[in-house]
Amino acid sequence: MMHSAKNVCRTCMDETGTLVDIFANVRDPVLDEPEMSLSHILARCTERPVKRGDLLPQFICVSCVLAVQNAFRFKWQSEQSYQHFFRVLNQSGAPENQVHLAACNGDKNQIINQKMQLKSDRQQDTQQMTKTQKPDDDLSQKQTLQAKLQEGNIDGPPESFTLHPRKRTCRTEEQADMIPKEATRSTKMICDADGYYNCPHCSKRFCSQTQLRTHITDLCNRCPYCPRTYMQKSNLKRHLRNHLSKPAHKCFHCSKAFMRKDHLKRHLRTHDSDGPLSCSQCSAVFIEHVQLEIHRREHKQRPGSSKSESTKDPDSDDSDQAQDLKPKWTKNTFNGTCSIPPMLKPKPICDICQKKFSSVYALKRHMLTHNRQHHLKKCTYCSEEFKTEKHLKRHERGHMGDLFRCEFCSLVFVDVNYLRKHKKRIHSNNVIAM
């Protein structure tokens, strides 16, 4: 128990990341200083003693190493710049006593500001502690923590500590299951004093519960092997099969294999031009062999082949076999006509560019591109053209001077809807006051 309690980060108390010995020597490539111990860097940044063999953990995670290096780098840079300006003031001929006086005043003001900040922080901490704890709880809590550290029976940080959870990515399905479903679905999330909703897994804040739920979903349902994210966990599990399982749907034209059947069907379309899925009598192509066989039967019942079929004996075996190959369409009980399957219906073709479309509606939309020049509305004041009469009238207001001016600022708009959106977005406080 004592060993597991010590194998945590000294600064963020994280035990899942990569831990580094706090007394290891590191060298910052940005600074000119030689290698120094992490404990020395941490002590200079936090102004807390770091000694080997104390009761606190002797490790620090990699992210905290980067953070403390950045802090030490900033402190070192500030000291270097201060020394540089001090040398410049000496070289400029300023009296030495004024230079030292300015430096002393600057240091004195800095010390006073630090003391005032520490005093205010202590007062805030004292007020928070008095609301939640009794006066004697602080001493007893320290004694309890020290006793637990010596015995190795510590399970987590005390309640008085303020933990800032770090952003983590759910790399496996087991880690994704650790996040409760109530946190993303039915649980009512409580906002803080500033009106923001804090993420329970990282330090981000959001203005609404919807944004927070979307963020949690993006954080948890993320693929650990690629940057894809999914709204539902079932879609993530189906996607993980692409990384973990072997493809089961193999193409019988080439050596490719796919995890899903619809992906295989999509791939088979590339073999339509030269594979067995293209009809030998026409240019029709199909995805499955069943569709191709039905299409071939359609060629056998056309009028071109009726002459050869009429010369045969209706009682012969060949005629029976040909009769079996004929497609048996289902008759419509309302008008007595045969209902042809949608895959065998001829696709609509554009008369101008000979393009094929999946539906008549798609063909009509395409025809608008050819007739665009006939339907454009031209402005009577300039050479601009517009698709609709509404856009043309809105444009002509600018020529006639019929504009909408904002009464709060000097902006002018062509459409009254634009003016309303502008007031709502920019002058919302003034509109409410009126």
From Swiss-Prot:
The modification Phosphoserine is found at residues 316, 319. Disruption phenotype: Severe reduction in female fertility. In nurse cells, altered distribution of rhi/rhino, relocalizing to pericentromeric Rsp and 1.688 satellite DNA arrays. This results in increased levels of Rsp and 1.688 satellite piRNAs, reduced levels of transposon-targeting piRNAs and increased stability of transposable element transcripts. Rhi/rhino accumulates near the nuclear envelope in a process dependent on the nxf3 driven piRNA precursor nuclear export pathway. Keywords: Chromosome, DNA-binding, Metal-binding, Nucleus, Phosphoprotein, Repeat, Repressor, Transcription, Transcription regulation, Zinc, Zinc-finger. It comes from the Eukaryota. A zinc finger (C2H2-type) spans 197-219, 221-243, 249-271, 277-299, 348-370, 377-399, 404-427. The keyword Nucleus applies. SMART domains: zf-AD, ZnF_C2H2. Pfam families: zf-AD, zf-C2H2, zf-C2H2_4. Zn(2+) binds at residues 9, 12, 61, 64. Its main location: nucleus. One of its GO terms (biological process) is positive regulation of piRNA transcription. Primarily expressed in ovaries and absent from testes. In ovaries very low levels in germline stem cells and cystoblasts but abundant in developing cysts and polyploid nurse cells. Residues 7-88 form the ZAD domain. One of its GO terms (molecular function) is chromatin-protein adaptor activity. It is found in: Nucleus; Chromosome. Residues 117-173, 295-328 are annotated as: Disordered. GO terms for cellular component: chromosome; cytosol; nucleus. Kipferl is the Austrian name of a traditional breakfast yeasted bread roll common in central and eastern European countries. Its crescent shape is reminiscent of the redistribution pattern of rhino protein in the nuclei of kipf mutant nurse cells. DNA-binding zinc finger protein that recruits chromo domain protein rhino/rhi to specific chromatin regions enriched in H3K9me2/3 histone methylation, mediating piRNA (piwi-interacting RNA) biogenesis. May bind to GC rich DNA sequences including a 5'-GRGGN-3' sequence motif. Nucleates rhi/rhino accumulation and stabilizes its expansion. Involved in piRNA transposon repression, particularly in the female ovary during oogenesis. The ZAD domain is required for dimerization. PANTHER family: GASTRULA ZINC FINGER PROTEIN XLCGF49.1-LIKE-RELATED, ZINC FINGER PROTEIN 200. Homodimer; mediated by the ZAD domain. Interacts (via C2H2 type zinc finger 4) with rhi/rhino (via Chromo domain). Dimerization is required for association with DNA and interaction with rhi/rhino. This is Zinc finger protein kipf. It comes from Drosophila melanogaster.
